Design a protein with these regions (language model features):
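P-loop NTP-binding catalytic core
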Residues: 18, 29, 68-87, 122-130, ...
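Loop/turn-to-beta-strand initiation segments
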Residues: 102-106, 208-209, 260, 343-346
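Phosphate-interacting basic helix/loop segments used at nucleotide- and nucleic-acid interfaces
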Residues: 29, 33-53, 89-114, 154-160, ...
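Charged, low-complexity terminal tails
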Residues: 1-123
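Residues that line or immediately flank small-molecule/substrate-binding pockets and catalytic motifs
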Residues: 31, 239, 351
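Charged, low-complexity intrinsically disordered tails
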Residues: 142-277, 284, 377, 398-503
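Conserved glycine-centered short motifs in functionally critical loops
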Residues: 52-56, 60, 64-66, 110-136, ...
Length: 503
């Protein structure tokens, strides 16, 4: 299995694609107009206690207060299992008022970004990640990634890390990539995390709440930290400034992977070269075709994600049971990739086609669970229910691909979605860049680019995205003009170049 990390950067957004064995596995986006707080640590202030929910709301300085449930409060009275450790929850459940009070300052970390009308989800179980280790400062505990299966290696890591934990009275978790890692790099990681924690403790004592005390890494550095490993063959970056910043980061924190860092300078945009743009477009469609003619229909709602498996009339020979089994098996192997690609999380209900034979159901379930084992996000998968459904969950920390790129459709009362005006603006700017690069000689004397688009898209260009428009125009030495067309749906547009400045 080979992996490549493709990093596409411009003035208005950063996109990172993970390619596994030639197929797009994950897509991450960070826009200049957006902000993700996941991973950030804040000194917050309790502003409201809700006993009925066993929760509090905490002001951390964002637009909306964060939500902190009692189960996410680190306490000597109640230590529940979290996503990183393996400590079982106790039966003691003290009242929320015995843990916190109004106006109390508290150190919290964002585990889920705001979504819809909900504020950020918070925890007091601080976890700070480095390349090989995760520091859990409030837990005197050594954890080893479950993906490290070799018993001798687990024992080696535990015996080496335990004295450090006892000395500092802080917990630590060995990440999957620490499998076989030299003790020197593990010590460097541990010392880095201790310095970060010391800085957080100092700032906490010297600032007033609400305030931020730790900021998660920029998207490109964070993904290099979290995704680059032994199977990574290449890290390609198409922006020189970003390339130099990443190289500087890797020289300090991941020097062993520096030979795999590559500056992409081809005229063909990097996402076009690797066919990523088409994969992103297909990932926004509800229907996914399966190899034998069946399909998945994926629908995302506020409450859950539903996945329906269909044969689409495909029949292999005369054995209907075998046809259904084959379609379900293909679906089970496809679903884990679709969850990662679309970044779907929360409760997921899968409606497989009914199978008569128990062994077929078990094989389908085994294939699904095997695919989920490769997912870096925490997942849980139950058995088939009496209704033939499979209920599973996937940890959700950030918006899904659809929530990032699309908005609810105003023509169907929110039951569907269309590409947002913001996403359309980003696509138009990328397209102008790409067409200019592919026709550089022809466009060298071009003075005007005419864009025909929906009124909402043009309105955004003249307001929120005006600075990005000006940057592109200056970079390409090209005047960009607009022709509104209300009949064009957001997500569609037309671009043409002209040397007639009177247009």
């Amino acid at each position: 299995m080979s992996e490549e990390l493709l990093i596409n950067v411009n003035s208005f957004e950063t996109r990172v694609a993970l390619i596994v064995s030639g197929a797009l596995q994950e897509i991450h986006m960070a826009r200049s107009s957006g902000y993700s707080a996941t991973g950030n640590i804040y000194l917050g202030k309790v502003v409201r206690i809700v006993p009925g929910m066993q929760a509090v709301f905490v002001d951390i300085g964002l637009d909306r207060p964060g939500f902190l449930h009692a189960a996410d409060i680190q306490s000597s009275l109640m230590i529940a299992a979290d996503d990183l450790g393996d400590v079982a929850p106790t039966k003691t459940k003290p009242n929320i008022r015995s843990l916190l009070h109004d106006g109390q300052t508290i150190l919290v970390q964002v585990v889920k970004d705001p979504l819809g009308k909900k504020g950020p989800r918070l925890t007091t179980r601080i976890a700070i990640a480095a390349k090989f280790l995760v520091l859990t400062p409030y837990k005197n505990h050594v954890g080893i990634s479950q993906r490290i299966e070799n018993d001798d290696e687990r024992i080696r890591l535990y015996r080496w890390l335990r004295p450090l934990v006892e000395k500092t009275q802080t917990g630590v978790i060995a990440r999957t990539i620490s499998d076989g890692a030299d003790e020197r790099v593990l010590l460097e990681d541990f010392e880095l995390l201790q310095r970060i924690w010391s800085t957080i403790q100092y700032d906490t004592k010297n600032i007033k709440a609400p305030n931020i005390v730790y900021t998660e890494l920029p998207i490109q550095n964070r993904l290099i930290r979290d995704l680059v490993g032994k199977t990574t063959q290449r890290i390609a970056v198409d922006d020189q400034t970003t390339f130099l910043r990443i190289r500087e980061y890797m020289q300090t924190y991941a020097p062993e992977f520096l030979p795999r860092l590559y500056s992409y300078q081809d005229d063909v945009p990097i996402f076009e070269r690797y066919a990523v743009e088409g994969e992103i477009a297909r990932a926004l469609e509800p229907t996914v075709s399966l190899p034998s003619g069946g399909s998945l229909v994926i629908e995302q709602t506020e409450a859950l994600v539903s996945i329906d498996v269909n044969t689409n009339g495909f029949v292999s020979g005369a054995d209907l049971e075998e046809t259904v089994f084959k379609t379900n098996l293909e679906a089970a192997m496809s679903i884990p990739r679709q969850l990662r690609l679309r970044n779907l999380g929360g409760i997921i209900v899968i409606d497989f086609i009914d199978m008569l034979e128990s062994k077929h159901r078990q094989e389908v379930l085994a294939a699904l669970k095997l695919g989920l084992e490769k997912d870096p996000c925490k997942t849980f998968c139950d058995d088939f229910s009496q209704l033939g459904l499979v209920l599973m969950s996937r940890k959700r920390t950030r918006k899904s691909l659809e929530q990032t790129v699309c908005v609810p459709c105003d023509k169907c009362t929110g039951t569907g979605s269309i590409v947002s005006a913001e996403s359309t603006c980003m696509e138009i700017l990328r397209e102008i860049f790409a067409r200019h690069a592919l026709n550089e000689e022809k466009c060298a004397g071009t003075r005007v680019c005419i864009v025909t688009a929906h009124d909402a898209v043009i309105g955004r260009f003249l307001d929120e995205d005006a600075k990005f428009l000006a940057q592109v125009s200056a970079t390409l030495n090209c005047v960009i003009k607009f022709k509104p067309n209300p009949a064009i749906v957001s997500g569609y547009f037309d671009i043409r170049f002209s040397d007639d400045s009177a247009l």
